[in-house]
Amino acid sequence: MEFLVQKIGMSRTIDANSTPVTLLKVLQAKVCQLENGKALVAYAMHKKHNKAIEGQQKKYQLSKEFNHFATLKASQQKELGDLDLSALETLKRVKASFKTKGRGFAGVMKRWNFQGGPAAHGSRFHRRPGSIGNREWPGRVQKGRKMAGHYGNELVTCQNEVLSFDKESMVLVLKGSVAGFSGAYGRIRAV
């Protein structure tokens, strides 16, 4: 069973052993279609609206706030309507999938923790990658070479222990951290 969530942020438990926790808001979703253990769900996110979304809302008789669609694994869901959240109350562990913070085009020191060169005394080799090849053989740069490039914005999945779930406020409390910035959208699924 999968659920759509939004990361609220991090906090800690107030007891003898202070435990770092992540707070996730479980999004209200409507099941529009069920097929082979998968569910097409609609959920509210921002105010994006166009004719294609309008057509989908008309097709599935949705109100205007449900303007995004996603496919989730929903083996226990038997009927259309609100997504069944009863499974969240008994969960012990979940896999949380989020995109990491995007850092744009980054150099080798930031992206791969390269040491860099001397900072002074006539050196012109400060933050550069250095040599990237071998000799006449292989005569090319080998695959997997650590270089400057796009850093972050990758899907990362980690397992977390569930500490509690508040059904009224729809807040799930996980032990430890998950990837992404506060406000990021992601998915959780039962382990």
Curated annotation (Swiss-Prot):
Keywords: Ribonucleoprotein, Ribosomal protein, RNA-binding, rRNA-binding
Record-level Gene Ontology MF annotations: rRNA binding; structural constituent of ribosome
GO cellular component, one term: cytosolic large ribosomal subunit
InterPro entries, alphabetized: Ribosomal_uL3, Ribosomal_uL3_bac/org-type, Transl_B-barrel_sf
Annotated region described as Disordered, given as residue ranges: 119-138
Keyword match Ribosomal protein: yes
SUPFAM superfamilies reported in the protein's UniProt record: Translation proteins
Keyword Nuclease among record annotations: no
Gene Ontology annotations of biological process type: translation
Subunit field text: Part of the 50S ribosomal subunit. Forms a cluster with proteins L14 and L19.
Family under the similarity heading: Belongs to the universal ribosomal protein uL3 family.
Task of the protein: One of the primary rRNA binding proteins, it binds directly near the 3'-end of the 23S rRNA, where it nucleates assembly of the 50S subunit.
Record-given protein name: Large ribosomal subunit protein uL3
Name of the encoding gene: rplC
